[in-house]
């Protein structure tokens, strides 16, 4: 079994990224004293797959898949619906999007699944993590109610391939996420 995985992330454009980083910093201020906290660049995970440890071309294949995705997809706007906290470390404090986000991103998932050698049963759940925290759930739920929700849709213009441990169990696993490639989505001029 592979110890590493590759995830494909949808990344915000500069304006949305600045706003999301401000919200993430605000969330971190509100929870830092209650437990460990870790942040990653704002992103929506589109798909995750095993990275073949014994195949030296595995990362190159992931980058090729990313290029294929970027060449066939255009920038997309997603509408924030709510902030919520869960017991899962990987969804400590997240921004949920409206129902149209799943419909909009399903073809992206299908494209990535089709080019995968192994079907992992990945379930698309469009959300954006503001932070990852070991703080008590009740405190994170309280914080989710205090953060101002953006009123306007957020524009996502880039995608990236990120390697990380195949199982995320602690903040060190989150911090180990490493971008191997990033590119702009197709945008006809």
Question: Which residues make up each language-model segment?
Answer:
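Basic, often amphipathic N-terminal segments
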Residues: 1-78, 99-160, 170-189
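Substrate/cofactor-recognition hotspot
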Residues: 81
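A short acidic, often aromatic-flanked loop/helix-cap motif at beta-alpha or helix-coil junctions
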Residues: 85-86, 169
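Short, basic/glycine-rich phosphate-binding loops at helix/coil junctions
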Residues: 86-94
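Active-site/acyl-donor-binding loops of N-acyltransferases
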Residues: 162-165
């Amino acid at each position: 079994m592979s110890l590493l995985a590759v995830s494909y992330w949808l990344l915000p454009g500069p304006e949305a990224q600045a706003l999301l980083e401000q919200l993430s910093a605000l969330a971190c201020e509100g929870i830092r004293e209650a437990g460990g906290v870790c942040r990653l660049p704002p992103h929506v995970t589109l798909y995750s797959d095993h990275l073949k440890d014994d195949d030296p071309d595995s990362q190159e294949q992931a980058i090729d898949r990313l290029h294929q995705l970027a060449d066939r997809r255009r920038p997309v706007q997603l509408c924030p619906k709510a902030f919520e906290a869960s017991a899962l470390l990987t969804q400590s404090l997240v921004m949920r999007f409206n129902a149209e986000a799943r419909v909009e991103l399903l073809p992206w998932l299908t494209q990535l699944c089709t080019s995968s050698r192994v079907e992992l049963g990945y379930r698309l759940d469009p959300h954006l993590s503001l932070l990852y925290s070991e703080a008590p759930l009740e405190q994170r739920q309280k914080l989710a109610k205090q953060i101002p929700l953006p009123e306007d849709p957020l524009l996502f213009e880039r995608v990236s391939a990120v390697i990380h441990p195949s199982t995320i169990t602690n903040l060190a696993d989150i911090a180990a996420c490493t971008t191997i490639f990033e590119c702009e989505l197709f945008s006809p001029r």
